[in-house]
Amino acid sequence: MFTLRELPFAKDSMGDFLSPVAFDFHHGKHHQTYVNNLNNLIKGTDFEKSSLFAILTKSSGGVFNNAAQIYNHDFYWDCLSPKATALSDELKEALEKDFGSLEKFKEDFIKSATTLFGSGWNWAAYNLDTQKIEIIQTSNAQTPVTDKKVPLLVVDVWEHAYYIDHKNARPVYLEKFYGHVNWHFVSQCYEWAKKEGLGSVDYYINELVHKKA
């Protein structure tokens, strides 16, 4: 069965971006619920002994929705950092090439996240076919992985991600999010996306050790 991963940072380390109470609900309640739901849905099925990556790429309906939400949240937590981190020269060059400048990437990313209608996720992902970085909106539980694109960065724009601290001010939440991006992690994702493609997603998920022995 699957278990809830621990946060990779202290709940009180994000300043005025997100509060410990927000993490108590978002991680401790919402994320935990997706784990519980998936365990209940796969019990006694062919997916019961499958990896999260296998479920994510081979399932549909409620099983997919809950598996995807587990992965999406896992990835979101790793995209956050209490303090600013530097992006690699390789990623910097790629963003400048694909978007014109780092400032333009930020502008496009925040605009995309702001205008995403309803609940969902806003991503930067590596397109294995074009070998370029794209900004992608996904609704509800959808993820670029199912379109064979490798996630590099994500922000959660479900209301439960920001309502406790920022009410309906999604743009304020997004601006503060950008000041807490773990660019070291994003840079690693880009490096491995170019080397291993979707295999890097499978490796990342397995490294989280969701499964009980």
From Swiss-Prot:
Pfam families: Sod_Fe_C (PF02777), Sod_Fe_N (PF00081)
Keyword Iron: yes
Sorted UniProt keywords: Iron, Metal-binding, Oxidoreductase
MF (Gene Ontology): metal ion binding; superoxide dismutase activity
Binding site residues for Fe cation: H26, H73, D156, H160
Swiss-Prot/TrEMBL cofactor(s): Fe cation
Cofactor stoichiometry and binding remark: Binds 1 Fe cation per subunit.
Catalytic activity: 2 superoxide + 2 H(+) = H2O2 + O2
EC identifiers of the protein: 1.15.1.1
Leader sequence segment: none
Class of this enzyme: oxidoreductase
Purpose: Destroys superoxide anion radicals which are normally produced within the cells and which are toxic to biological systems.
Family indicated by similarity: Belongs to the iron/manganese superoxide dismutase family.
Subunit structure: Homodimer.
UniProt-recorded name of the protein: Superoxide dismutase [Fe]
Organism placement in taxonomy: Bacteria, Pseudomonadati, Campylobacterota, Epsilonproteobacteria, Campylobacterales
